[in-house]
Amino acid sequence: MNKNTIFSYRIQGIWSAIAAIVLSAGLSSCSDLTRPEALDLAPASQETPEEALALIRAFKQTPHKVMILGMDAVSDNPVARWQHPSSMPDSADYIYIRNLKGGLDAVLASEIGAVQSGKGTKVLADVDYVAIENAWDELQKMKEEAGEATGTQEEFLAFISEQTRLQLECMNAYGCDGVMISYTGSASSTVGDPVQGRSAYINAVYDWWNSNGAGKIIMARGYLLNIASVDVAEEFFGQCRYLIHLVGTKTSAGSVASDIFTNTIMGVPSDKYVFEATVPTPSDTTQIGMSVPDAAKWISASSETEDFEKLGLCVENAQDDYFRIGRNYADIRRAITILNSGTEAAQ
């Protein structure tokens, strides 16, 4: 048996271990909820936990379908394990953290380096356009209440550029491997042309990245079709390692494929796609759109009618998958097994 075959068998054992992890922290005490240690893999048949993590790090260097997870930053006093980057499944390739500009608790910040070195997981700072618009709207409401004139379109565009820069700078401030550029539409009700706002945002990213992005990773997620209308879209897409398309409320692969066909016509590259699905929330267990395991099955399957690459899966609200009785991150772990083995492990 050659070395590569042995490595392959051992990796398959790791995926079995991933699928078998259960919620060890429990809900019995506050200390269990807040301790920051990683929920590491139970050792496979012949590996210690350290050896298992070494195999996962090695696997992440090989061609495979990637898993990207999104989580929220907590600026002070995390109270639950799901708020910790270290609690995310060991086999996640990337974690992007939202709202780092609002600050990150020191304990959580220290875990960024730990997951990078221990698990080989890349950590990205999220740069969110909607958050910028929301901040602008709040500022305008305060001005109106104070009887002051609201900002002009020119001031709004300058605000976008400045706030984009501040979010981008979180990459280096927290030792991240790169950035996730999130454009999920225009939410502002106090400004005019949303196209100008979108253009200011992407141009600010593009200019900053050309000066500060050497050796780092950039991805884009959201409404890629809208980004395609920006004047630097071709160059910007060229910089991105992955382009993350939102499945949204769609439940059929055909509907998603139709969206990609339209994107391609409008200039979005077809060879960088990762697809984003969501898990139900603790407050509403209704599945919206394609489930994470179903999305993984579609992504791992080949099709002669799909003229685009399916490179992996993104889960925007990964933290919500923590809340399972008896098993944390159940849908994500199932999806990881499906993506990397083509089959679903026994549940």
What are these regions (language model features)?
Residues 63-130, 134, 331-338:
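N-terminal carbohydrate-binding/catalytic regions of secreted carbohydrate-active enzymes
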Residues 83-89, 107-123, 169-174, 231-238, ...:
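Acidic (Asp/Glu)-rich catalytic clusters
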Residues 66-70, 124, 202-230, 240, ...:
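Aromatic-lined carbohydrate-recognition surfaces of secreted/lumenal glycan-active proteins
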Residues 71-89, 153-172, 226-235, 288-304:
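Short, acidic/polar
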Residues 1-13, 17-62, 67:
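Bacterial Sec-dependent N-terminal signal peptides
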Residues 100, 104-197:
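Substrate-binding cleft of extracellular glycoside hydrolase catalytic domains
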